[in-house]
Amino acid sequence: DVFVQSTVNRAAKTLGGNYTKEERIQKLKEIARETVDIRGIGLYSLGSYRKGLNDDQKQSYEKAFEYYFLKSFSSRLAEYSNPEIEVVSKKKINENYTMVNSILVATESRPVVKIDWRVYTKDPENLVIRDLIIEGLSLARTQKEEFASIINSNDGDIDALLKNLNDFSN
C-alpha cells in the first residue's frame, strides 16, 4: 500500500538521519499529525465513557490525548535506528477500512516483527491510520483497556484519566 509505505519511508528516513533524539521526536510528531487519526483513536480509547463528557471535558481530553499520544508514539519510535519495514499485502476489510500487513525486518538484535496497519479509507483523498496491530496486539484496544482501568479504579471519574494524561505529558 502506497500510503503506508510512504509513511514508513518518511519515518525510516527520520530515524536513520543525522538528527538528535529531540529532532527525531519532533519530525516523528509531524508525520503522526499528518497520517494518524489521533482524534479518532482518542475517542475510541475512551469507549462508552466519551458519552458522559461535557464539552469542557471533551476539549480537555482531546488536547491531553493528543499530547499523550504524540509523546508516547514519538519517544518509542525514536529508539529505533534504521528500521526497515516492508509492506507485504493489503486486504480491504469493508468500505471504510483496509488492513495493510507489513514486517519490521529482523536485525542481529531483534527478530522479525509483524505490524498490521488499520487504515481508514472512507475518504480516499485523506487516508489516515486508525490502529497498529503489532504481533497481533491492537494498540488502540490496549489503550482503551488501560484508560478504562484508570477510570474504573477511580470510581468512574474521567478527571482522574485527564490528570494521568496531563502528568504523563509534562
Walk through the language-model features, giving the residues of each.
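Juxtamembrane/interface motifs at transmembrane-helix termini
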Residues: 43-47, 79-84, 149-151
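Short, charged helix-to-loop "capping" segments that act as catalytic/coupling loops
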Residues: 106-110, 121-123, 153-156
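Low-complexity, intrinsically disordered terminal/linker segments enriched in charged
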Residues: 131-170
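Solvent-exposed loop/turn segments at secondary-structure junctions
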Residues: 50, 67-68, 106-107, 134-139
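Surface-exposed, charged secondary-structure patches
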Residues: 71-113, 164, 168-170
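Short beta-strand edge/turn micro-motifs at domain boundaries
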Residues: 112-141
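Early exported N-terminus immediately downstream of N-terminal targeting peptides
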Residues: 1-73, 77
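Short loop or secondary-structure boundary microenvironments that flank
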Residues: 18, 91, 133-136
